[in-house]
A protein has these predicted regions:
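FIC/Doc superfamily catalytic core
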Residues: 1-175, 179-243
Length: 243
């Protein structure tokens, strides 16, 4: 699949610059799909149409108030990812706190959790709070290692999965850590030049994958789902820029 992605990127490189209206359309589609996929994995039942309504200022009927709040939080995170990636800012520890702030609304300097945490739907006991400084140092080392990874290599998608899995393993804040893991994974790939993507999976399928990750500490193929989403977005861009 990576070989096909490379071919698509070369094809699109021969078609730039895109007309402004097409560039905006691609970004809108990318944003909507990214928000939708993440909401599905958070247990939301919002449709793409309802998400679009929220982003246009209309609150759908018969939805919990938390749903439109999360849509706006994810939109803010997406737009900030775009801004930072265009500036070439590398994934770093400060970014973890910043994106946690965007998706939860808590202060960006909020300390790591200070209580023990049992995540029942993943059957997982997170590291003790006293272990968090060491665990976050491991995440920092992973970010530094990620800087040297070739964007057009399988290692890039393995690294994306490693970043996701490490944030999940550590659970630094005790709330929305799965979403935070996916945001950091998305940003890593964006900074490498890819579209923003989140796995197109059912919530149960994703949870089962996370359970395997936490039990084995091994990669479980999440990178393949990310490649699939990237390829679908690139195919759309090729289709709509064909002469």
């Amino acid at each position: 699949m990576l070989r096909t992605i490379k071919k698509r990127i070369i094809m699109l490189g021969n078609r730039v610059p895109f007309a402004p209206e097409k560039q905006k359309y691609f970004e809108d589609v990318e944003r909507l799909q990214w928000i939708y996929n993440n909401l599905v994995l958070e247990g939301s039942s919002l449709t793409k149409h309802q998400i679009q309504d929220v982003m246009e200022g209309t609150i759908p009927q018969n939805v919990a108030i938390e749903e439109p709040i999360m849509v706006e939080a994810l939109r803010s995170a997406f737009d900030e990812m775009y801004f930072l990636a265009e500036k070439g800012v590398k994934p770093c520890m400060e970014m973890v706190g910043y994106f946690n702030h965007l998706i939860t609304g808590y202060d960006r300097d909020i300390p790591y959790r200070k209580t023990s945490l049992m995540v029942h739907h993943w059957d997982y006991v997170a590291p003790h709070p006293a272990e968090l400084p060491e665990k976050m140092t491991e995440l920092d080392s992973l970010f530094k290692e990620a800087e040297g990874v070739d964007a057009m290599s399988e290692a890039c998608f393995e690294m994306a999965e490693k970043i996701h899995n490490k944030v999940i393993e550590v659970m630094p804040y005790g709330e929305k850590d799965g979403l935070l893991a996916r945001v950091m994974t998305s940003y890593f790939l964006m900074e490498k030049g890819y579209p923003a993507v989140a796995p197109d999976m059912k919530e149960q399928e994703y949870n089962e994958t996370v359970i395997k990750v936490l039990k084995t500490r091994e990669l479980q193929g999440l990178g393949e789902f990310l490649k699939k989403e990237i390829l679908e977005h690139l195919d759309l861009m090729i289709q709509l820029t064909a002469h």
